[in-house]
């Protein structure tokens, strides 16, 4: 067989990725041809990719070629995969071809490209979310995944065309993009030029016809699709759960101290990367580790799983010695000072550690030395002489953080002796260009020193076997998988585990008494020692791999030490240690249009947040809303204002406050009787579906996406109130008053559910709602899997008051100036912000009502198969109303670019 591909041919991407599967199954020659070369003699125009079979026949559809390769590998066809392939050909390709032509050939950008794509991208995201599987056709990669990945890659490799709200699509795309066959295919076709590599090929192709305009918006489509997929059986099941109420909740487990695993139950051990004690954490540090882990820990407790959440300050190493010199203190004094600062910051942010410890303890020394001795006796420790930088003026070897210079990889002028902050690459200090001693600023010289190394090559097979068993069925984030795969692909090398320092865990070996363990060897052991300081039964957590699920949260730069160095250490120690099952790594959070910098006064740091006057829960909400899960994200003051005033004040807070106020004002503070109509029953089922979706997302640690489920339920609640108008019905006849009671009772129960769903994200707000509604204790501490009636008729609520305050533009502008952040690129101007925040809640209610009514008009016309022009006119009205509503709610509206069609 011979496969013909072309550089810059989009169809060559999936074909090359699929061809990698067929290697060894058949003799395959791959030839690269020009875009004008006619391979298939009977086609009227040149076309690649082409597969010439041994029989002399040709396959010249990318999908057909991929199918052929998969069949060679023994793939068995299934209906779902075939359905995806049909959809790709009939729905995705027309939209995608037009978008690529607009971008590459015509040079258009932004919404001109993304606008037509939103529907198809949302469909993929929604399908992945619904089936709760990592791939399109199930738990394993299929032909459909390769074909759709190849089709989408040229566009989605640019984060601008992969909307952040499509979390399931992001995760799927990144998982496939990090696989070696896909990476090689991308390198072959795009040649590291990105989408521009397609220009020559696409210029030779006929211009694709643009897809017909959509008759409804994506948000409307989503809404209809979700409701339409609820079967009568779904509704009956949901209503049955609703009617059981609190009886359906399991018995409330008593809280124990210390928290210990229980055989036969779900036992979850959660760690957050240990922050360096000498640094005050900024918002990016907080969301990357402790806050993300806190959300998951709180969720696990709501599920009544035995959950231990721990963290602590990483106190040994060169960074501490350097900070001590700067401040004229001893290392111990520095550790005491900054440990207290860290603890205070996390306390203010509401981080619910079961224990927050430190690494400068006798337990740390004992456990680290024990693991080292076991590695030593088993032959996994090497001795070698290392070339090191020595400062003759200071008469000492310079450990990595005592030296700075120019990065040998990217040229960054302030690179440390261990890692470059700009490119992230690990560095040996002697590789630095123009090195300087951080203490005296003199130029150090190279000298030799004997050190100990962890023999990672000798442990590589054990590591790969463990990864092969662990990662496929786990929730490792795509970036964590990619980072570890990259290290293994390059081959592991012995890793130095000692340093010429005073402040650290002593090395218990003759001849090395003047050295300490390298912080990257013993810092991860800190999780174990912190647990040992929490309970003398620590081995029930850390030497119990069969019964404990270990989740570790971190920023992506910490992945090699948690996914490679620490596992190799304990695998070599052969002492039945619990190994990580799930590594949850974030990308980086930037500040406005730059980076956080304490020295330059740029960005909000943890000790400053409480001085802004903005409550901790608002910070939590916004950081979790923009959590950098699939790509870097940026903190923006303008966006914080918009999200607070729209999502919290006008959406979530407005609904919960109205629900409670209706009970107080119209029904004397007692929940009224509820007589559910078919529409109410359907709403119960829809809320249950959204709740189950929330569970599925959080069980997969998709924290940002699960937050959207909360906001979706509150939006439906607002719409439910607007449509049914209980404030009017309460003044009517008996039937109207009964209807007002049902709507109010349903709404206040939705508010009760939201209070529990909010608990992992906004614990103080959650507690406030539960106090206002006088929620029963069991309902506060257990999150049901279905929407149940927790506030039955006759339940008396407490005093209801607003949950959130509006953020004013002047207030935010002052904070932006105070923290040194310039206006973020692309952010609305102050006048625009005034416009989006000026609308009152009554105006928003009116617009919401109008959108609902107009949506019903459009749906009815479509159901009647009315004249297309009539439908188009009504759709235009609906779009205009939605635009007005988005503006009133403070949601940014993209101005269409380019010329209008005539």
Swiss-Prot record:
Q: Name one GO cellular component term.
A: cytoplasm
Q: Which residues does the UniProt record annotate as the domain WHEP-TRS?
A: 843-899
Give GO terms: molecular function aspect only: ATP binding; methionine-tRNA ligase activity; tRNA binding
Q: Name one Pfam family in it.
A: WHEP-TRS
Q: Where is the GST C-terminal domain?
A: 74-212
Q: Which UniProt keywords apply?
A: Aminoacyl-tRNA synthetase, ATP-binding, Cytoplasm, Ligase, Nucleotide-binding, Nucleus, Phosphoprotein, Protein biosynthesis, RNA-binding, tRNA-binding
Instruction: Mark the residues carrying the PTM Phosphothreonine.
Output: 837
> According to its UniProt record, where is this protein mainly located?
cytoplasm
Source species, domain of life: Eukaryota
SUPFAM superfamilies in the record, alphabetically? Answer: Anticodon-binding domain of a subclass of class I aminoacyl-tRNA synthetases (SSF47323), GST C-terminal domain-like (SSF47616), Methionyl-tRNA synthetase (MetRS), Zn-domain (SSF57770), Nucleotidylyl transferase (SSF52374), S15/NS1 RNA-binding domain (SSF47060)
Q: Where in the cell is it found?
A: Cytoplasm, Cytosol; Nucleus, Nucleolus
> Transmembrane region positions?
none
Name the cystine pairs.
Answer: none
Catalytic activity of the protein: tRNA(Met) + L-methionine + ATP = L-methionyl-tRNA(Met) + AMP + diphosphate
The answer to whether keyword Oxidoreductase applies is: no
Motif 'HIGH' region per UniProt: ranges: 275-285
**Which biological process terms from the Gene Ontology are attached to this UniProt entry?**
methionyl-tRNA aminoacylation; rRNA transcription
Query: Its function?
Result: Catalyzes the specific attachment of an amino acid to its cognate tRNA in a 2 step reaction: the amino acid (AA) is first activated by ATP to form AA-AMP and then transferred to the acceptor end of the tRNA. Plays a role in the synthesis of ribosomal RNA in the nucleolus.
How does the annotation summarize its subunit structure?
A: Monomer. Part of a multisubunit complex that groups tRNA ligases for Arg (RARS1), Asp (DARS1), Gln (QARS1), Ile (IARS1), Leu (LARS1), Lys (KARS1), Met (MARS1) the bifunctional ligase for Glu and Pro (EPRS1) and the auxiliary subunits AIMP1/p43, AIMP2/p38 and EEF1E1/p18. Forms a linear complex that contains MARS1, EEF1E1, EPRS1 and AIMP2 that is at the core of the multisubunit complex.
What is this protein identified as?
Answer: Methionine--tRNA ligase, cytoplasmic
